[in-house]
Amino acid sequence: MQWQDHAIILGVKRLGETSVIAEVMTRDRGRHMGLVRSGRSRSMQPVLQPGNLVEVTWRARLHEHLGEFRMEPVRLRAARLMETATAVYGVQAMGALLRLLPERDPHPYLYDALDVILENMQNPMDAGELFVRFELAVLNELGYGLDLGECAATGVRDDLAFVSPKTGRAVCRTAGAPWADKMLALPPFLAAGTVEAANGESLAAAFRLTGFFLHRHVYEPRGIEIAAAREGFIQAALKAVNAVSLDRPDNPPVIAAKR
């Protein structure tokens, strides 16, 4: 059996003295593993870095076998991704999110989103918002998508301010006010129909929102912890926002975001 596809490197594991098992995210075949012979060679090590885009050919005798990868570089961006803390942690955290999905299960939307985010991860001001939207997309692909398009109580699409922790649906400010202390805040930049950019406060609220539902629907039922790289990314992203906020008195810095 054989197929060919574009793939993004997620990670590698050493196998013997010269080979590695590579983990990649492909567009048409999802997250996939394969043996790379001579993967530890001087020529292949720069190619097999997380975040790089490659053209991969997979061969195996049977579909269920691990199989062997042959790789050709398409876009080597790992060196650039290592220049900022947000990018370093972001690549690791997004890889951990993709490992929540079944292996070899196609998720073309997530592949495309990952590729776009990696191209823009070097800008810390964009990285936080893109990462939050990626977490929302993963929740949706796992069957736990949030409905942020209209108020669950009234059906209106304006002034959406809360998210119900029970249903994952948006609630407008008027309808949610009596239960505001029990609701999750809906950051304005995530509300349907808005074009507002994220700032420190709204970004911290967004991390709390996605973290809550990831923990409730995914990590807690599976008995696993949220990847440490996520917290590293959050701190790096908020630090970058805080640095910009020092020059903008109307945007007070935000110190941390907790689940």
From Swiss-Prot:
GO-annotated cellular components: bacterial nucleoid
GO process annotations (BP): DNA recombination; double-strand break repair
Alphabetical list of Pfam families matching this protein: RecO_C, RecO_N
Keyword DNA damage applies: yes
Record's keyword annotation contains DNA damage: yes
Keywords from the named record: DNA damage, DNA recombination, DNA repair
InterPro entries, alphabetized: ARFGAP/RecO (IPR037278), DNA_rep/recomb_RecO_N (IPR022572), NA-bd_OB-fold (IPR012340), RecO (IPR003717), RecO_C (IPR042242)
Record PANTHER family: DNA REPAIR PROTEIN RECO
Family of this protein: Belongs to the RecO family.
NCBIfam families tied to this protein: reco (TIGR00613)
Task of the protein: Involved in DNA repair and RecF pathway recombination.
Protein known as: DNA repair protein RecO
Species of the source: Rhizobium rhizogenes (strain K84 / ATCC BAA-868) (Agrobacterium radiobacter)
